[in-house]
């Protein structure tokens, strides 16, 4: 069964929040390159030359798309230069602040839960005066200090009826138990009276964990304590009472006492429990699945010493206001890395991220993980996120872990779950995209999660029971539309900047809670400023390229202004850092000149003598007299020589000097030219009757791009090795074969109905090749760092071709506008 092809391309037309621009960070080399680019080619010649879803239906969509226009060029280069003046030093305070946050990570920073605090407050004093006083008075003080002005308890920034009702009732019960604060109890009961009707209006997806059992249990406790002024018979409660009975009957009583399950997290208020058996399932830290409320209830029922030690420890740690769940160390470490990477700012925190991933790897098990280390219950959400990040960071993790979450052809988050979580399947899909050859369980996970999420999308049901996020539907859509191979780094960052809610994103446990190291405005501010800084630099480079394009008359060879933008966009979307301007501009310029020469060679292919002379002139630089008869030949010959001079000047300096760089660039271009001239007419072009698409290069141009990028990056040894030994390097050969397949697939896609079978076959071949390449790229080995970087360049350029092959033009143009021109 083929992989589900994720490209129906449902273009989003949401209005995006726009913010003011900042300048772009500048590195010395980037400044030099930008000045030359803006100056134009006349300044570049001062140095003397040294000698389940059918792949064929990719572009068919049920919606009518209007072609997006690329945003217009900015005004004057000086305007952009003024905007670019802010140095990277302006970002340093934010970078330092985030770094301090990352280095503070321990067992998880999370907000207090009034509900859990109330359960701990209900624990009577051990060995005291018959239980007439609370064992943990700090929790009572916290309750008194945190009542909201409307009489309720709960999250003050986001109103959820479920959250406010269960928090408020729990706090009223706790205060009533100790006959404290009658006025506060009265205010809480008044709030419950006035808002009970809201429970009937709430969506089921936003119901906290175990609410159907915990809330009725609290109501019964209130009744037992003699709380009179409570609407016990309110109509909104009837369905909750009924659901409680249904859920209690569904709980496998014997199993929950024999093996660890997620039920351990919600024991409070459950009747008829066999505590001696349940104590055998206690977590190693003394808790019941890291739940303060469940553990407090167990402590009241058993007096267990380990339960007491766990509760006592967290009460002291959090000054009375205990969290909804603790610890959450693995959850925090994993999600922090994910947020930093998707926001496009991970490059500032490589050491901290490496420490996070080492921590996660130490606690990884073949059965999976949970939100906390050493958990005896695992879940697919944390497991999938950890698997994906560990694999992307080079750790050797087996996909067989997902067999623990598969049954009867379906995948689940927890054993015995009642509903499927959208984010669980979302993260499973993201993990399944990082697959190697032969990993069938990941194939099954990808098919299942893809179909589940697409169905929810069609139903308008992308809502989750674990998080209230700013734009979860947008996150899901992007992941399905642009899987890992097709997700270019700067496109992902620009998209996620509009989706990340910062401190406003809220998690759903037994109550609403917040993870300040996962969701905060500091990350968002740094990411926005960093993106806008980089974007300003990219706009300067675009202005320089526009001038360079016109001065070299590339329009005479079929290269259009939009092609300039698209070529630069592919480079900037993969190599975006200010310090790598030379590599980025080398990629864009080489792509455009190569396209122009390719067009020219096709145009003169019938004139064998002219073709031979043109190629001969380009590598015999002193023999140019014949060119006077052919103005177009003169234009291209001059443009290429200027480009080689410019690239040699902008390349990272090396010990051998600029002349050696110039020689290597000339050699790479000469070899490419000879291959292009001697190449037979491509049978795919002949069959399709169309010109090749400039964004999807053939293997010769693909290798030329990589060689030029490596030379300009100063990795000369790798570039020389590539030129001399590419036929013997399997990684290079496989990337070239994949490039050919992408080129072929792009041509066939002009008539998907006619070529559906062939496209499907090619897609399978491309998928297998990409899996094999990914395995070689990601797994840690003893390669030199420079070799790994060269592999990364091969991979980045190939991914850009994969993206261009599978993206309709209007979508590419939309991304060009958002990445290059539209500030966040």
UniProtKB/Swiss-Prot annotation:
<dbReference type="Pfam" id="PF01397">
    <property type="entry name" value="Terpene_synth"/>
</dbReference>
<feature type="binding site">
    <location>
        <position position="381"/>
    </location>
    <ligand>
        <name>Mg(2+)</name>
    </ligand>
</feature>
<dbReference type="GO" id="GO:0000287">
    <property type="term" value="F:magnesium ion binding"/>
</dbReference>
<feature type="region of interest" description="Disordered">
    <location>
        <begin position="1"/>
        <end position="87"/>
    </location>
</feature>
<comment type="similarity">
    <text>Belongs to the terpene synthase family. Tpsc subfamily.</text>
</comment>
<feature type="short sequence motif" description="DXDD motif">
    <location>
        <begin position="379"/>
        <end position="382"/>
    </location>
</feature>
<comment type="pathway">
    <text>Plant hormone biosynthesis; gibberellin biosynthesis.</text>
</comment>
<dbReference type="InterPro" id="IPR008930">
    <property type="entry name" value="Terpenoid_cyclase/PrenylTrfase"/>
</dbReference>
<protein>
    <recommendedName>
        <fullName>Ent-copalyl diphosphate synthase AN1, chloroplastic</fullName>
        <ecNumber>5.5.1.13</ecNumber>
    </recommendedName>
</protein>
<dbReference type="GO" id="GO:0010333">
    <property type="term" value="F:terpene synthase activity"/>
</dbReference>
<dbReference type="GO" id="GO:0009905">
    <property type="term" value="F:ent-copalyl diphosphate synthase activity"/>
</dbReference>
<feature type="binding site">
    <location>
        <position position="465"/>
    </location>
    <ligand>
        <name>substrate</name>
    </ligand>
</feature>
<keyword id="KW-0934">Plastid</keyword>
<comment type="function">
    <text>Involved in giberellin biosynthesis. Catalyzes the conversion of geranylgeranyl diphosphate to the gibberellin precursor ent-copalyl diphosphate.</text>
</comment>
<feature type="binding site">
    <location>
        <position position="247"/>
    </location>
    <ligand>
        <name>substrate</name>
    </ligand>
</feature>
<dbReference type="InterPro" id="IPR050148">
    <property type="entry name" value="Terpene_synthase-like"/>
</dbReference>
<feature type="transit peptide" description="Chloroplast">
    <location>
        <begin position="1"/>
        <end position="63"/>
    </location>
</feature>
<keyword id="KW-0150">Chloroplast</keyword>
<dbReference type="InterPro" id="IPR036965">
    <property type="entry name" value="Terpene_synth_N_sf"/>
</dbReference>
<dbReference type="GO" id="GO:0009686">
    <property type="term" value="P:gibberellin biosynthetic process"/>
</dbReference>
<keyword id="KW-0479">Metal-binding</keyword>
<keyword id="KW-0460">Magnesium</keyword>
<feature type="binding site">
    <location>
        <position position="379"/>
    </location>
    <ligand>
        <name>Mg(2+)</name>
    </ligand>
</feature>
<dbReference type="GO" id="GO:0009507">
    <property type="term" value="C:chloroplast"/>
</dbReference>
<keyword id="KW-0809">Transit peptide</keyword>
<dbReference type="GO" id="GO:0016853">
    <property type="term" value="F:isomerase activity"/>
</dbReference>
<keyword id="KW-0413">Isomerase</keyword>
<dbReference type="GO" id="GO:0016102">
    <property type="term" value="P:diterpenoid biosynthetic process"/>
</dbReference>
<dbReference type="InterPro" id="IPR008949">
    <property type="entry name" value="Isoprenoid_synthase_dom_sf"/>
</dbReference>
<feature type="compositionally biased region" description="Polar residues">
    <location>
        <begin position="44"/>
        <end position="63"/>
    </location>
</feature>
<dbReference type="InterPro" id="IPR001906">
    <property type="entry name" value="Terpene_synth_N"/>
</dbReference>
């Amino acid at each position: 069964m083929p992989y589900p092809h994720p490209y129906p391309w449902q273009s989003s037309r949401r209005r995006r929040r726009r913010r003011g621009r900042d300048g772009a960070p500048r590195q010395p080399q980037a400044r030099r390159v930008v000045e030359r680019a803006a100056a134009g080619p006349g300044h570049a010649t001062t140095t003397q030359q040294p000698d389940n879803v059918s792949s064929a239906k990719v572009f068919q969509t049920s919606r009518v798309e209007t072609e997006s226009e690329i945003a217009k060029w900015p005004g004057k280069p000086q305007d952009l230069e003024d905007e670019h003046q802010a140095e990277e030093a302006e970002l340093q305070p934010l970078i330092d602040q985030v770094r301090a946050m990352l280095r503070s990570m321990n067992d998880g920073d999370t907000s207090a839960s009034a509900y859990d605090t109330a359960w701990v407050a209900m624990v009577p004093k051990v060995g005291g005066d018959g239980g007439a006083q609370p064992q943990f008075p700090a929790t009572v003080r916290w309750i008194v200090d945190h009542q909201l002005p409307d009489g309720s308890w709960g999250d003050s920034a986001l109103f959820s009826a479920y959250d406010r009702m269960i928090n408020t009732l729990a706090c009223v019960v706790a205060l009533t138990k100790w006959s404290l604060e009658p006025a506060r109890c009265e205010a809480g009961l008044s709030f419950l009276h006035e808002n009970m009707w809201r429970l009937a209006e709430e969506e089921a997806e936003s119901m906290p964990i175990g609410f159907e059992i915990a809330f009725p249990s609290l109501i019964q406790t209130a009744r037992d304590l003699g709380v009179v002024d409570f609407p016990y018979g309110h109509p909104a409660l009837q369905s909750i009472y009924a659901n409680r009975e249904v859920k209690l009957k569904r709980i496998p009583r014997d199993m929950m006492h024999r093996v660890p399950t997620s039920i351990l997290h919600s024991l409070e208020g459950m009747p008829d429990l066999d505590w001696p058996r349940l104590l055998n399932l206690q977590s190693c830290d003394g808790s019941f699945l890291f739940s303060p409320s469940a553990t407090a209830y167990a402590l009241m029922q058993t007096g267990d010493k380990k339960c007491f030690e766990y509760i006592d420890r967290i009460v002291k740690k959090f000054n009375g206001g205990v969290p909804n769940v603790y610890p959450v160390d693995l959850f925090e470490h994993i999600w922090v890395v994910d947020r930093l990477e998707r926001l496009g700012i991970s490059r500032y925190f490589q050491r901290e991220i490496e420490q996070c991933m080492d921590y996660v790897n130490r606690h990884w098990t073949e059965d999976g993980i949970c939100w906390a280390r050493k958990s005896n219950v695992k879940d697919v959400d944390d497991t999938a996120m950890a698997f994906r990040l560990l694999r992307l960071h080079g750790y050797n993790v087996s996909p067989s872990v997902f067999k623990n979450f598969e049954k009867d052809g379906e995948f689940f988050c927890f054993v015995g779950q009642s509903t499927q979580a959208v984010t669980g399947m979302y993260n499973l899909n993201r993990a399944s995209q990082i697959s190697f050859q032969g990993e069938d369980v990941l194939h099954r996970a990808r098919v299942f999660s893809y179909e589940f999420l697409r169905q929810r999308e069609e139903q308008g049901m992308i809502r989750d029971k674990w998080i209230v996020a700013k734009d979860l539907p947008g996150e899901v859509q992007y992941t399905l539309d642009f899987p890992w191979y097709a997700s270019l780094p700067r496109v992902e960052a620009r998209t996620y900047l509009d989706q990340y809610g910062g401190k406003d994103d809220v998690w759903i446990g037994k109550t609403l809670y917040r993870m300040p190291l996962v969701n905060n405005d500091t990350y968002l501010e740094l990411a926005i400023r960093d993106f806008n800084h980089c974007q300003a630099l990219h706009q300067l480079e675009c202005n320089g390229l526009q001038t360079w394009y016109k001065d070299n008359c590339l329009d005479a060879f079929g290269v259009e202004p939009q092609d300039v933008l698209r070529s630069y966009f592919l480079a900037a979307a993969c190599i975006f850092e200010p310090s790598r301007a030379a590599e980025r501009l080398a990629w864009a310029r080489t792509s455009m000149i190569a396209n122009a020469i390719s067009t020219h060679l096709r145009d003169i292919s019938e004139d064998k003598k002219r073709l031979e002379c043109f190629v001969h002139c380009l590598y015999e630089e002193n023999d140019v007299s014949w060119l006077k008869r052919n103005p177009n030949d003169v234009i291209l010959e001059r443009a290429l020589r200027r480009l080689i001079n410019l690239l040699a000047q902008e390349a990272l300096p090396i010990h051998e000097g600029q002349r050696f760089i110039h020689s290597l660039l000339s050699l790479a271009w000469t070899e490419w030219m000879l291959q292009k001239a001697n190449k037979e007419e491509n049978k795919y072009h002949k069959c399709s009757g169309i010109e090749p698409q400039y964004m999807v290069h053939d293997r010769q141009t693909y290798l030329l791009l990589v060689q030029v990028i490596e030379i300009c990056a100063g990795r000369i040894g790798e570039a020389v090795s590539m030129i001399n030994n590419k036929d013997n390097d399997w990684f290079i050969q496989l990337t070239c074969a994949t490039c050919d397949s992408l080129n072929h697939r792009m041509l066939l896609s002009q008539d998907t109905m006619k070529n559906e079978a062939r496209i499907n076959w090619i897609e399978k071949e491309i998928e297998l090749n990409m899996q094999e390449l990914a395995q070689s790229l990601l797994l840690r080995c003893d390669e030199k760092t420079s070799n790994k970087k060269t592999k990364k360049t091969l991979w980045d350029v190939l991914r850009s071709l994969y993206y261009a092959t599978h993206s309709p033009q209007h979508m590419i143009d939309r991304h060009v506008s958002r990445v290059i021109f539209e500030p966040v």
